[in-house]
């Protein structure tokens, strides 16, 4: 259980939560299949294990792991449009009259209802770690929309969830640009070989570099011309590597082999033990990594009144 992406949310109040209370709350919002006429469903499922008795909350030390599953029926717009056109053409030819918008919309609704039970079903899961002692919720996603879906459903289940996206005092683009420009990152962070540069104008150019020496003259010329670094690949303390963007999304997170080997050793032969060991080691690593990252980026910003 290693997160591949990371969106960080700050709890703005103490979250008095224990595993039993969280388990009971999530049980009120379980994942379930789409009914024949439903476009989508969303709810919580067991992060580890299967079956009705698998817990919806995995607890390790004072960290909680939860998982939400979205199920949706995929009905391509082109299929609906083609079926609607065929129906409209049929009516206009047989009845010798024009089909206007109100009737067309009604026909479209009827077609959707007819096609829905036969539509393909897509399932996707999103994991999140709740760390009350750190005052953080960590979502394994690079999509703010997916994270908000999980958090809003968690809020409904709990009745309240005082949380906001974590922010820092200095604009991330300014810090990332400075790191590339000076060829040196702060603390135990090291610049790697990938970045994205954007012009400051809204319709300006974008330069994406991969497997490139970011200390090169070419990159420095882009910076001199006014481009800002909006994504940058970094390594931290020989433990993990990642890509950080200007919204503080951590993408393509990769834990170094030594950590993974340690988790395998700690987990033993049992599959659940392996998952628990990797989750625990990941969260302990995050407990060191995230404060270091926020400090390197200029410190966490605490909005007034919070």
Swiss-Prot record:
It holds the Pfam family RdgC. It comes from Pseudomonas paraeruginosa (strain DSM 24068 / PA7) (Pseudomonas aeruginosa (strain PA7)). This is Recombination-associated protein RdgC. PANTHER family: RECOMBINATION-ASSOCIATED PROTEIN RDGC. Disulfide bonds: none annotated. It is found in: Cytoplasm, Nucleoid. Transmembrane segments: none annotated. Keywords: Cytoplasm, DNA recombination.
């Amino acid at each position: 259980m290693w997160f591949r992406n990371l969106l960080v949310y700050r709890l703005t109040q103490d979250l008095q939560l224990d595993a039993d209370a969280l388990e009971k709350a999530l049980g009120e919002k379980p994942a379930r299949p789409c009914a024949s006429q439903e476009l989508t469903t969303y709810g919580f499922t067991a992060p580890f294990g299967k079956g009705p008795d698998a817990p919806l909350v995995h607890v390790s030390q004072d960290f909680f792991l939860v998982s939400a599953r979205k199920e949706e029926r995929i009905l391509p717009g082109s299929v609906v449009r083609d079926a609607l056109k065929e129906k409209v053409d049929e009516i206009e030819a047989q009845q010798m009259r024009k089909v206007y918008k109100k009737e067309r919309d009604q026909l479209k609704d009827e077609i959707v209802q007819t096609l829905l039970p036969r539509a393909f079903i897509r399932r996707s899961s999103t994991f999140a770690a709740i760390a009350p002692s750190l005052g953080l919720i960590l979502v394994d996603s690079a999509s703010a929309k997916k994270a908000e879906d999980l958090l809003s459903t968690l809020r409904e289940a709990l009745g309240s969830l005082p949380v906001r996206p974590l922010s820092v005092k200095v604009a991330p683009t300014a810090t990332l640009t400075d790191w590339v420009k000076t060829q040196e990152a702060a603390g135990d962070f090291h610049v790697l070989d990938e970045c994205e540069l954007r012009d400051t104008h809204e319709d300006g150019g974008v330069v994406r570099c991969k497997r490139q020496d970011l200390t090169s003259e070419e990159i420095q010329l882009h910076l001199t011309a006014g481009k800002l670094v909006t994504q940058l690949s970094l390594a931290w303390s020989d433990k993990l590597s990642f890509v950080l963007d200007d919204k503080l999304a951590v993408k393509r997170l990769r834990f170094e082999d030594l950590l993974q080997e340690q988790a395998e050793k700690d987990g033993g032969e049992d599959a659940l033990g392996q998952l628990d060991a990797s989750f625990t080691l990941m969260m302990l690593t995050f407990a060191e990594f995230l404060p270091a990252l926020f400090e390197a980026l200029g410190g966490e910003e605490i909005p007034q009144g919070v």
